Amino acid sequence: IFKWFKEWCNDEFSHGEAFALLMKTDPKLTSGINVYWIKFFLTAVYATMYVRDHQRPAFHKALGIDPSEYGQEVFAKTSELSRQIFPITLDIDNPRWIRNLKKMHQANLDLAEAENMTGLSAIVTRLGARLNAGLAFVSLMTIPAKSNTVPASTRLEPVY
């Protein structure tokens, strides 16, 4: 997939490099309370990617890609790159990680199903789905992060 979108990927990579340099200029950005914001940011980005990728099963089937396996591969590569900037990485190998991403995906399916409902059943389904998604996200946030010693110099390299 990255071969087909090479130019877009290179552009996104350049944005990441610029972001990394900005983060490196002020160590306060990656310490103290900001570590929690980093964890929130990474968790939100990864969870969003997982849910969105699972919304397109025909696309992934046409490419011959399993979106769950693909997601874990992208999470691993992204985590490796983020180690150069952030003092933590997410524990994507924790059993709760995939389990809660699947719960978020199911909550998203339930929300989509509620679009075809009316009345009280639609309200209850939407409320339940949002609650389930929120609880799954909180569970993802409570997975202990892995500490990381950020290297003095940053050398980001494209992984594809």
Q: Would you name each region that the model predicts?
A:
Residues 1-160:
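Non-heme di-metal
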